[in-house]
Amino acid sequence: MTARKFETRRIGKTALEVTTLGLGCASLAGIFTGVPADQARATVGHALDKGLTYVDTAPQYGLGRSEHLVGDVLRERRAGVVLSTKVGRLLKPVPVAEQDKGAWVDPLPFNQVYDYSYDGIMRSFDDSLQRLGLNAVDIVYVHDIGAGTHGVEGNKPLWKQLETGGYKALRELRDGGVIKAIGLGVNEWEVLMDAFALGDWDVFLLAGRYTLLEQTSLDPFMTTCIKRGASVVVGGPFNSGILVGGATFNYAKAPEAIVAKVQALEAVCREFGVPLPAAALQFPLTHPAVCNVLPGPRSPAELDGILDWWDVKVPDELWTTLAAKGLLAPGTPIPSGMA
């Protein structure tokens, strides 16, 4: 099977380079609907066959299931792959009857405990290596810290853990050469601005906040990334489904205003003969801070569909028209300049 040639971009100031399209492995762990293990492993293998070099997983995904599945494949195919996982959640074994499964259909028999302390970060990292069955990963993200996940008051002690010990652990891992890059993986850009006050970071995985539909993170976050030399991986490029014909926006029923904006985006795309999902997938890379777009297919067939959208030629005039109609935030980078 011939691998595609993808553009690669550098992660921050590190020596790491990734293909501009990556593989997010949350869906493979069975969020909302189950994914057979063989299908999940086949999807990871198919991504590598097609030339993708960046794979992202996390302890939370299937409460350990995703890391096991990803490790099953990468133990035989580690060369040339940039792998990221996340820290901040420890998995504790529990009887299935007492388990909080969340949105996972068939998770492994654990509950998650948040811990962003020095010891918690180190334990989480070691646990991930064991689940993966690997002796190294390349990137470690602090996962889901922030008021959006924990509430304003609930986040305060957790942030204190990161501030007083967790960040030190990450720096030790990176500066000691154990890992190559550190960052945060979250759904809210505001906490990333707080993170800049702790020190330097290499890359942030931000889900759903810099998409064709929503550019709320544009300023000050994305502009600060440029100034600080940090890269951005854009997760959730379809805003959980609304940009691929679904009815959900950020995992909830889409409000009428969002539906109306999607219809307006789709009308412009139709004018240029471009499928809306193709424009949504390619849009984030118009920003110079973005190094990778990270969709989460559930099968090799879904990945092939994503690759078809990736191959669509999007004319510069489409972005210019979106900007002229006020469908992109002012200051959004587009090939012709700024919206």
Language-model-derived ranges and their functions:
Residues 13-31, 87-111, 141-150, 243:
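N-terminal small/glycine-rich loop or linker at the start of catalytic domains
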Residues 34-47, 117-131, 187-194:
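Short, acidic/polar
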Residues 4-14, 67-81, 121-136, 217-231:
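Short amphipathic alpha-helices and their capping/turn segments at secondary-structure boundaries
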Residues 97-139:
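Active-site gating/metal-coordination segments in enzymes
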Residues 5-10, 39, 60, 73, ...:
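Beta/alpha (TIM)-barrel catalytic core signal, keyed to glycine-rich beta->alpha loops juxtaposed to Asp/Glu
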Residues 17-21, 51-53, 78-81, 134-138, ...:
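Short, well-ordered coil/turn segments that N-cap beta-strands
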Residues 1-93:
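N-terminal binding-site loop/beta-alpha segment at the start of enzyme catalytic domains
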Residues 82-86, 138-143, 231-238:
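Non-cysteine beta-strand/loop elements that form the S-adenosyl-L-methionine
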